[in-house]
Structure formats: structure tokens, C-alpha cells
Amino acid sequence: MEKNEPTQSKYDAALAKYNTQLDDAEIAAQAARIIAEKVPANNTPEVKKFLFNCIDLTTLKSEDSDESVMKFTQKVNKFDEEFPDLKNVAAICVYPNFAEVVKDTLEVEDVKIACVSAGFPSSQTFIEVKVAETAMALMEGADEIDIVISVGKFLAGDYEGMCEEIQELKATCKEHHMKVILETGALKTVSNIKKASILSMYSGADFIKTSTGKQQPAATPEAALVMCQAIKEYHELTGIKVGFKPAGGINCVNDAPVSYTHLRAHETTLHL
């Protein structure tokens, strides 16, 4: 009697279409080579002005309050007066309970309201809580939602559990952009970063993002390289173009052109 072969899950089948067996040392060498050869050409005032306009200006502190978030938002309102030669930031990013404060205070057009949600930064709570928090953030005025993958589920090989959460949260977001944070510092290997990138895009991410900024290492050149490669390959295979957002570890103005260089090399849409 023949034994039935185990059925491959649709998530394993999705991963099988890509090379996810990457070597950490090779990726590190490739990232270093790209930085040495191409970053100097992108380290220009024009590029830095473009990158500034991609920033999500963020306050995610335990001591945030209505008053502090109002003052934070006023900085964006006054930006054009103080820096007339620069375009404003892309978004203000806050905890979901401050979405309405930003909405009521923000006076400038073309600056979005982004909220972290779904148990940020650990993603360790019930899916019902994640969905409710996300829905409430949108109801209070959020234009974009940032969530974190269930890293524990991913590392345990529970791709179905991780992906179904992302899919349910994207269904809640509907037409609103949803950025999916991989928390690359917790994934340890570039192979895991590649797999998490593909699974997140497969599950409906509009952008994939390196990290919460709460854990180190964060937006490393190696993580940026692998994520941008994954985005390019996913686009070539599906026709769906997903954006990229580096976060955490970008500590000064000269760090940003590194991520921009990987973006340009892989024709990727950027959010900072």
C-alpha cells in the first residue's frame, strides 16, 4: 500500500519559487561592495532632500501625551515656514490612541497619519485585539498602519499562523497602506529575512519594513539588500510592486543614502 506524500502548504509552495538559501557572508560582502561602489554617487544634497520627503516623523515613547503629540505635530505645521526649500515629511507616526490628536492638529496637506498597531512592538496579543486596535486607529484618523509580524510563529515554522494574521489585518486596512515590520534583528539570518519578506508580500503587505527601532540590529545594509532583492523578485514573478521602508539604525543624514542605493539597484519604492 502506497503511503500518501505530505501535502506542501501554500506558503511553502510560495517560498519554493524563490532562492531563500542565502549565505550570510556572501550577502555581507555584496552589501559592502555596493556601498563602496555606489553610495558615494548617491550621497548628494538632491538625494538627501528626496529622502527627507520619505520620512515618517515618529514619536513612540511611553511618556507621549496629548499635549506632547500636539507640539510634535505643530513642528510639521511650521516646517514650510522654517524650511521653504524642502518638501515636508511623508507622515507623522504615533501610537493609535493619538491618531485623533494628530488629525485635529495637523494643518498641512500631503502629510499622512501613520499608526503602529496590532500589539506593536512585540505583536504578542490576541488576533481579535490586533484587528480591533487597527480598526480603531483607522476610525480615529490613521491613513496608514504599521504592524509587526508574529516573529515567534515565523521562527517556529508556523507560516500559516503568521500569514493569516497579516491577511486578516490587511482586510481590516482595506485601501489603506499597511506596512509590515519584519523585525530583522530577531530573524538572525539573511535566509530568514528573505523568507519573511516573501511571506509578508504574499499575505498582502503594501510595504515591508526592517524593524520597530526597539531592537538591535535594525536597518542593516544586509537586511536592506535582501529585502530589496525580494521585492524585485516578487514584482517580476507577480507583477505586484511592494514598497520598502528602512527603520532603526539610521542615525544620521549620511546613513540614509545606503538604503537609497539598495532601492535604486533594485527599482524599489521607498518609505523612510
Question: Can you describe what each PLM-predicted range is?
Answer:
Residues L60-E63, E82-C93, I147-G161, T212-A219:
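Glycine-rich, proline-tolerant flexible connector loops at the mouths of alpha/beta enzymes
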Residues P96-D110, T125, G152-L169, T189-N192, ...:
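Active-site-adjacent beta->alpha loops and helix N-cap segments on the catalytic face
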Residues N53-I55, A90-V94, I113-V116, I145-I147, ...:
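Hydrophobic faces of well-ordered beta-strands that scaffold small-molecule active sites
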Residues E2-L51:
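Charged, compositionally biased N-terminal leader segments and the immediate start
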Residues D56, V102, A137, V180, ...:
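Conserved, mostly hydrophobic/aromatic
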Residues K87-E140:
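Active-site cofactor/substrate anionic-group-binding motifs, chiefly glycine-
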Residues L57-S65, V116-V129, L155, I181-N192:
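Active-site mouth loops of central-metabolism enzymes
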Residues T261-T268:
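Conserved small/polar residues in nucleotide/adenosyl-binding loops
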